[in-house]
Amino acid sequence: MSQQVIIFDTTLRDGEQALQASLSAKEKLQIALALERMGVDVMEVGFPVSSPGDFESVQTIARTIKNSRVCALARCVEKDIDVAAQALKVADAFRIHTFIATSPMHIATKLRSTLDEVIERAVYMIKRARNYTDDVEFSCEDAGRTPVDDLARVVEAAINAGARTINIPDTVGYTMPFEFAGIISGLYERVPNIDKAIISVHTHDDLGIAVGNSLAAVHAGARQVEGAMNGIGERAGNCALEEVIMAIKVRKDIMNVHTNINHHEIWRTSQTVSQICNMPIPANKAIVGSGAFAHSSGIHQDGVLKNRENYEIMTPESIGLNQIQLNLTSRSGRAAVKHRMEEMGYKDTDYNMDHLYDAFLKLADKKGQVFDYDLEALAFINKQQEEPEHFRLDYFSVQSGSSDIATASVKLACGEEIKAEAANGNGPVDAIYQAINRITGYDVELVKYDLNAKGQGKDALGQVDIVVNHHGRRFHGVGLATDIVESSAKAMVHVLNNIWRAAEVEKELQRKAQNKENNKETV
């Protein structure tokens, strides 16, 4: 049996289901590139049949990613499999992941079928997927609540049909680690052709043991772990990949397996996912939380100073978290900024140097010293907002005092035209938003507002993340500045640009569909 554990990332599929607003194709690609840099073996990037937007993003990622295998999800439905293959075919090689429920409860109440019919359907769909690729993964949905003998029948038939990877999910996060290990061991005992496939696991965290279940399964013989960065996902989330990866690395003495992950990219990838998905990482989160390497106890601090291994089982550097440096000021040139970005692991393609340096100089004039975390925040915002903007914040002014009412004046560039409006609101942020909405005429409802400090001290950058509802769809925006009101205004303008771009994409899709229809009529 191979000693490599394949890392299968589903941040962009299962993980995205936890978000209040769907990611754009560009945001998904940004995360996919970070995952590729970290070295994930397989990335599941969407469910193409679900929407034209998901199809487009899967296709874009499949065309771009070269060093990780790109995968798409499909139910055991002919159309699902055909559409997934259509989206993925631009890749040099790809995986189709198809699934059907196998537990008695799901078969009886959801599928209204029988186990024999489920097996027959699974076999047919696996063979259909094999017409497009020899890399087919099959999942037994709700395997954790499927009797092992029934599960063994399904797995044996799926392998005979051509599935190269068999995934055993604990779909509802119900199974205990010793039970889950027993399921994997039971399959190895019961399935005669199990050596012809890789056994995978996909665990959920409803009882807080997703990582424990995955590690127990690996110890029992599973050689692929599925999960998401930071553990994001439906309900209580997925197995946190960074925790599994580092557990395997730190406890290689008893796990006796390894991954091909570049663990020095873990922290940056985690931050990228957190920022783009607008899901802050808890301070006490294992591996990537801000307190993961903090020592407040005097006894612990003394022990760490004498020997870090007294209280640290791994180092911050092992996940790519280096010490903060205070070496950039308004007198630092472009070369110094570029060099520092390279030291932090960024490539030229990760940011626009002209835009980044302009933002750096403005911030350095305000703060004096610019920290690494400032640069990273600027680079992230730079990447998020580098697309052409229809709306641009030209000027704003706010008057407020001890009363509840605030007044804001805003000038907004709308294409080539500058428009101005004033409005009152319950506080400066509300007043700004009322004025912006008057200018654009967009009917948006604010459903989430988050403010996070990026850095330390009174002059730290403030990042505002908002989610708005617009005609039944949710859109995310982000703004960054040392002034909270300015951050809030920038976040709303970012949202409006995302809404505008979505409308333009919809128009383009409709145009293509109409052209296709016209061509049919011509033929």
Swiss-Prot record:
Keyword Cytoplasm tagged: yes
HAMAP family reported for this sequence: LeuA_type1
- NCBIfam families xrefs: leuA_bact, PRK00915.1-1, PRK00915.1-3
What does UniProt give as the signal peptide span?
none
Catalyzes what? Answer: 3-methyl-2-oxobutanoate + acetyl-CoA + H2O = (2S)-2-isopropylmalate + CoA + H(+)
- Name the coenzymes or cofactors required: Mn(2+)
Q: What is this protein called?
A: 2-isopropylmalate synthase
A molecular function (GO) term = acetyl-CoA C-acetyltransferase activity
Task: Name where it's found.
Answer: Cytoplasm
